[in-house]
């Protein structure tokens, strides 16, 4: 099931879920399976020419684009680059990563997103900005279930397969 709010439906139609979250409710059983980096992405023309955006503090002159479900990505990034008080010209929230990347490709601002979304997109109009800056996302992908669901063999097998798959990366 790929619908939103999968964690709230555990035990009510879902045996387990893979969720993107900062943390899990302690009443749930959870295993972090993957944690991504935050990338800054913009139109190629933003990093070219005499007015190129080349320094993190220049983000203050730009519109920042953030996925609505990953609202803390910009805060985590600005803290990591040592600019905790940096405020952009504007912040636009998107419900779709694909729409956010298209807006970035058209030069509407700088997208703050997870590395894996950019890797899957492959658009020559986009460039990773501030490539020398590595910032871990505050969000992780979690395997989650109600503790009693671990009594079900398919749930245990799925969990074990996920853990094995991502430990090899």
Residue ranges and their predicted role:
Residues 1-26:
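Central regulatory/effector-binding core of bacterial HTH transcription factors
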Residues 3-4, 20-23, 42-44, 113-117:
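Beta->alpha turn/N-cap motifs
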Residues 12-19, 38, 104-110:
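Alpha-to-beta junction loops
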Residues 25-30, 34, 121-131:
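Ligand-binding "clamshell"
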Residues 27-65:
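Flexible hinge/capping segments at coil-to-helix
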Residues 63-82:
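Secondary-structure junction motif
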Residues 85-129, 136:
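Hydrophobic hinge/microswitch elements
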Residues 132-169:
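A late-sequence structural motif
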């Amino acid at each position: 099931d790929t619908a939103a709010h999968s964690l709230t439906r555990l035990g009510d139609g879902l045996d387990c879920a893979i969720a993107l979250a900062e943390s899990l409710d302690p009443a749930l059983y959870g295993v972090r399976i993957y944690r991504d980096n935050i990338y800054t992405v913009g139109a190629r023309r933003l990093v070219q020419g005499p007015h190129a955006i080349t320094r993190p503090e220049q983000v203050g002159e730009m519109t920042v684009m953030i996925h609505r479900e990953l609202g803390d990505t910009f805060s985590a990034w600005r803290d990591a680059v040592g600019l905790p008080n940096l405020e952009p010209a504007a912040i636009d929230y998107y419900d779709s990563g694909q729409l956010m990347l298209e807006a970035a490709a058209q030069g509407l601002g700088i997208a703050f997103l997870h590395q894996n979304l950019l890797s899957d997109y492959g658009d020559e109009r986009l460039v990773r900005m501030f490539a020398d800056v590595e910032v871990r996302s505050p969000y992780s992908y979690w395997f989650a279930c109600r503790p009693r669901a671990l009594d079900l063999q398919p749930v245990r097998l799925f969990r074990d397969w996920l853990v094995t798959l991502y430990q090899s990366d």
